[in-house]
Every structure is written in C-alpha cells, then in structure tokens.
C-alpha cells in the first residue's frame, strides 16, 4: 500500500508527540513501541497539566484498561480539550462488555468527544455498539470475519468515527469504505499489551494522515513487524523484543512487499 509506506516515512520525519492516558500494565511497552517506530510518547494524566500537554501533543490516545475514580475524569477532560483543539483522538475501550463501568466510560467518551478512531477487538466493539442502542451489533463476542466487517461498518456509522475491529483479520471502516488487513501473527496474543501498542501506533499515524488511512497504516506496520519478529524469535519473551526491533527496522520497501490489504466499497 503506497499510502502506508509514505505515512511511515512522514511519521519518522515529523516525530509526532503522542499523549497516552493508558493503563499501568502497558505504559512501558507502549512507550517503547512508539519510540522504536519513530514517534515520541508521553504518558501524562495529571489533571493540572492536561491542558498544556494536550495542546502540544500531535495526537491523544485514551485507553481504559485500568480505570479508577481519578483516571476517568482525566480521560474525559483530555478528550474534551483535544476535541476543542481538533486534535486526533484514538479510543481503546479495553474490556468493554466485561463490566458496566468499562462500557459506560467508553460510551460517555464516544458521546461527547470527537473520536477519530475507535480501536478494539471484536467483543469490545460489539459491546459498546450493542449498549448504544440504535444498532445491536452482534450477539456473540466470538470472532467471525464476516460479522467483524459488518461490526466495523456499523460502529463507524453509529459513532461517526473510524472503527477498527482487530482479530485474525483486521477490519477498518469509516462507514463508506472498508479495509481488511491480514498482517500480524498469533504470537501477539501471548504477549500482554500488543493491542494497546497497536492503538498508540494508530495514534502516531493519525498525526500524519486522515483517521481511516492512519488506522490502516498502524495495523499494517505493526502486523508486518510482528510477522518479521516471529521469524527470528518464536517464543513470547524474545518475540516481544524483536517486535520492537522490527518496528525500528521496517521501511517503505518492506511495507510494499508484505502488506496484505483489501479495500471494499460499501
């Protein structure tokens, strides 16, 4: 994909600052992934500095993985500021559907903030879409590629955003077009935080292109990096380190050789 390759080069040339309000579990691995790729991470959630931090950031990533009574207002305030400043916002509704708090928090942010990309797995996106009411989404959280395509399309229309439903095949839609991406590796499921890292990488790309192409770019680049990492390190611990290495090593040529993307008009 030409635009993915070009976005990779543009990202490295501009070194976008990506503000992450993310969960404790993945802060380190997310920051390392962004650094390896060529972006600059900042993990900042203190209420008193949000206005300053969001104003200098190129994009905001909100990840609800470890919610509490202090972090929720911080996420909401940051999303409001970023919306007012027209900064791209990527929302990862981690665990939506598992508890009412997670689903409610994700839906509240979706309702008032101008979310550029909603990135989650099949069950998470199905949960927020079903709870929202107008469209029930799917009944089962089990992955099905055809249902994931419909889910991505319906979520994009319902929330007026780009929806990225990730799984064995990733599906990204703005409600009018759908990209299906087959890059990635099953070993990613054996390392915590890989989905969260993907979300933040989409955030980095959202600083250099529109939300639809940013989501596709992030998924392709992270997926190819995982594929290459597995060829050198087929075990979880060393695999994680090799993913960082390949995020650093991946270039336009490799993207053009390895990208597995199909585009569909709705």
Swiss-Prot record:
Signal peptide: none annotated. Keywords: ATP-binding, Kinase, Magnesium, Metal-binding, Nucleotide-binding, Thiamine biosynthesis, Transferase. ATP binds at residues 119, 166. Its cofactor is Mg(2+). InterPro entries: Hyethyz_kinase, Ribokinase-like. It holds the Pfam family HK. It is an enzyme of class 2 (transferase). Pathway: Cofactor biosynthesis; thiamine diphosphate biosynthesis; 4-methyl-5-(2-phosphoethyl)-thiazole from 5-(2-hydroxyethyl)-4-methylthiazole: step 1/1. GO terms for biological process: thiamine biosynthetic process; thiamine diphosphate biosynthetic process. GO terms for molecular function: ATP binding; hydroxyethylthiazole kinase activity; magnesium ion binding. It catalyses: 5-(2-hydroxyethyl)-4-methylthiazole + ATP = 4-methyl-5-(2-phosphooxyethyl)-thiazole + ADP + H(+). It comes from the Archaea. Its EC number is 2.7.1.50. SUPFAM superfamilies: Ribokinase-like. Substrate binds at residues 43, 193. HAMAP family: Thz_kinase (MF_00228). Belongs to the Thz kinase family. Catalyzes the phosphorylation of the hydroxyl group of 4-methyl-5-beta-hydroxyethylthiazole (THZ). This is Hydroxyethylthiazole kinase.
């Amino acid at each position: 994909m030409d635009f993915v390759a070009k976005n990779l080069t543009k990202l490295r040339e501009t070194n976008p600052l990506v503000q992450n309000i993310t969960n404790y579990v993945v802060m380190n691995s997310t920051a390392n992934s962004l650094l390896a790729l060529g972006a600059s991470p900042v993990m900042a959630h203190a209420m008193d500095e949000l206005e300053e931090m969001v104003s200098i950031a190129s994009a905001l990533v909100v990840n609800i993985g470890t919610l509490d009574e202090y972090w929720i207002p911080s996420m909401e305030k940051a999303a409001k500021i970023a919306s007012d400043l027209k900064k791209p916002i990527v929302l990862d509704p981690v665990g939506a559907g598992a508890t009412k708090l997670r689903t409610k928090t994700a839906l509240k942010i979706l309702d008032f903030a101008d979310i550029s990309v909603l990135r989650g797995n099949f069950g998470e996106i199905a949960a927020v879409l079903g709870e929202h009411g107008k469209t029930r989404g799917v009944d089962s959280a089990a992955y099905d590629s055809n249902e994931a395509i419909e889910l991505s399309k319906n979520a994009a229309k319902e929330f007026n955003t780009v929806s990225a439903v990730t799984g064995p095949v990733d599906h990204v839609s703005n409600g009018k077009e759908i990209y299906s991406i087959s890059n990635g590796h099953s070993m990613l499921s054996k390392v915590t935080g890989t989905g969260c890292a993907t979300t933040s990488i989409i955030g980095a790309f959202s600083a250099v292109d529109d939300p639809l192409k940013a989501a596709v770019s992030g998924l392709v680049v992270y997926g190819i990096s995982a594929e290459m990492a597995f060829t050198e390190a087929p075990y979880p611990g060393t695999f994680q380190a090799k993913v960082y290495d390949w995020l650093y090593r991946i270039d336009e040529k490799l993207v053009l050789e390895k990208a597995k993307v199909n585009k569909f008009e709705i």
